[in-house]
Amino acid sequence: MKIFRLSVLAALGCFMMLSCDNSLEEWTPGEGGNSGTTPETPETPVVKTTYHVKAKETFDAIVRCYQITSGATKGFFNENYPKGAGDGAASFLWPYDGLVAGVATLHKLGYDVGYKDMVDRFQAYYRPSAVLNVGGYGSSTNGRTGGGDRFFDDNAIIGIELVEAYHLLKDPKYLDWCAQIVKFYQAGIDNTMGKALWWCENNINQPGNDNSNKPACANGFATWFLMKYYEVCPEAEKAAVLEMAKTLYKWLYDNLRDKGDNLYWNSKGADGNINTMKWTYNSGAMIAGGVRLYEVTGELHYLNEAKATANSSYDYWVRSRNGIPLCYPTNDPWFTIQLIKSFIELEPHDKSFTRKCMEVFISNLDNAWKNGRMNTGLFYEDWTGKNINPDRDKQLLMQAAALESLGVVALYNP
């Protein structure tokens, strides 16, 4: 994996002091159901603002609008801004993990943003037991203990951030937490339709239940996590961790790869049916997993498979959108940043390809900064700014994706 050389610059530019009051504009649905008022372009800084400063400004806006300042969940973040009547005491695990990933980039860039405290709060989502009598991370928290269903993909992205935290903070407890995720996987893998993980422990092998499936997200991100953990795990664990990663990768490659374009379908249901929807992040996870498997095993087919999926991903998802000639999808920016990170994983083996992909992404991000934000400094889901959807734009996950995107670009192109 590429190791970035950081050059933390002094923070130049004017910081916009933005209020979170009345941040969502009144929405008037158009014929398409998700069009509305023209987004207000934020005030342009007097001098060109570097990406690390933009990332910090975005984090500050998230803190102002989403962070909980009192009660049992103080220090956590709300799922939506404004908070909805049916929202939980704190956000679900997925958007919180996305936020921690963004904060990790700020920590790398030299900002003191409470990174360690945020990582440690993962444990408030931990459940020592549920359907499977083994510990794993639940989807919700009351500020002290975990609750909700336990998803295998959620646990994978937590694991990825715990490995990152170990690299940055050097605290061995994060490796202990990763080892527990591996045990959760060992308990969750079965041989139904081939040896792989289900989406959620509550929906294992239930034909007729659409939520009972073995998905690309759980198995792909588990592979990515396992290969990151392999680098730092105790020697006694390495053989089992590598074998599990290879097993999950092979299942995905054999069961959910579209042989026509080397992209990955969404899932295989308990009834054996394939959900053929293709999402950026699923292919991204397999790119990253393939690169790392090649780097560890030396087996060239992993790298060739990663390159094939990467090239098809660019060709399939980068197209003209809303007047922008080359544009990644305008929905689900968290999915997109996972694909982008997989392209960066590939860079040591295909620098020109990664640079091409990054140039388009950086251009999209520049447009988002100019045209795809609210007057609070928060981002719309659609970075072109053409389709405003308050029900989606208000989500913490959208802001976490923007923050991580800015941080990743700052590290890639400081």
PLM regions: where:
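Short coil/turn linking the two alpha-helices of tandem helical-hairpin repeats
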Residues: 107, 166-170, 230-237, 294, ...
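Oxyanion-binding "anion nests"
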Residues: 279-297, 302-318
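Bacterial Sec-dependent N-terminal signal peptides
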Residues: 15-53
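Extended ligand-binding groove/face enriched in aromatic
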Residues: 113-232, 242-246
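Sec-dependent bacterial lipoprotein signal peptides
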Residues: 1-19
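CBM-like carbohydrate-recognition segments
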Residues: 44-102, 106-153, 214, 301, ...
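Active-site cradle of extracellular carbohydrate-active enzymes
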Residues: 217-229, 238-290
